[in-house]
Amino acid sequence: MQSPRALLPKASMSDSHSNNGFSVLRHRNFALYLSARTLATLAVQMQNVAIGWQVYSMTHNLFDLGLIGLAQFLPFLALILIAGHAADRYDRRNLVALALFAQMLCGLMLLLFAYTGLSAVWPIFAVLVLYGSARAFMGPATQAILVNLVPQQDFSKAVALSSSSFHVAVIVGPSLGGLFYLAGPKTVYMISSVLLVLAVIMMCLVKSVKQASASGPASWHTVLEGLRFVWNKKIVLGAISLDLFAVLFGGATALLPALAHDVLHIGPNGLGALRTMPGAGAALCSIALAFFPITRRVGAWMLGGVALFGLGTIVLGSTTSFVVALVVLFLMGAGDMISVYVRHLLVQYETPDEIRGRVSAVNSVFIGASNELGEFESGITAGWLGLTRAILFGGAATLGVVGAWTVLFPALSRMDRFPHDDKK
């Protein structure tokens, strides 16, 4: 079995160990990949605001907001392990391009619905099922390909800059989505579809990259190999399951349309601002990490970031102030970014390249469950407890998860350096 680092591109003599976090953009493949991912994220974030507001305006049902996440998660869960094996067996670059193309088709269908008019929400949920299927193949390939696009000494910078660009799109996307929604949903869907077309073109320009391929035919044994790897690597299991349960309980994103409408009394533009702030906090944090990476007490940093997320959720459920909600969501995004940064580096450093896609698939299951399934859980809890009580419960549960994981995974909380640093 090859070393997890063996498939990284070799650095040339001219590649300096610059402290400039943006120096990694000199690698053409990475720059194109980053552009495609950023454009696609921007488009999807715009669509998310439009879909959430459109569905809630049509039904005024908190449960329907939860169904938005469930419609994406179920096909994602059904296909993700197979998609992980595909990311290890086939060209990851082509898989990302095909997944982006499928997302583009979903955007065009939403645009068609907006032009023809909708009297029911089920066509939107049908498109979200297709989108969840595309995301199943997008996730593992997107995560696994990054380590093949840059030399070893630039990998942590690539992770931080990739996260930065993602969260910049998360900042700009909801704001633009809320702004353009003032002209109607068709405007949002038209612009997002154009962005997805550009993303497909960018990804098609990425040249073939060197990667280890899975050997042998697909079987349940090979498909489940990533799951076995994660289960046996307890520190990896602890890191990705921490994110799963913390965001599963603490994620209040699905409830933001109702919070904006019923508690803060703001419109779609204000909702866009709320959706922007977690990304703003995460982007600023990730830019800082690109220049000042975490190298010591990484486990404590990760747990602290999740704790900040939980505390912010409690404050969010307690306030009726739009300004306070904006500040709290900003801090929640920063805390979440610290956790994401540590988890991503830990998983990539620990994973051999020939099973990287399948391990990324497991990681994607945990992320998808925390996000989309968390949205469904939020909708159900809000229906039972009420909007603000559901948010408060989620924040308290997140803090409980942090405490429990400190006890259940002591190696994670005590982790001082990343594994590759310990070997130096």
Model-flagged regions — what are they?
Residues Q2-K424:
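Alpha-helical transmembrane-bundle signature of multi-pass membrane transport and export proteins
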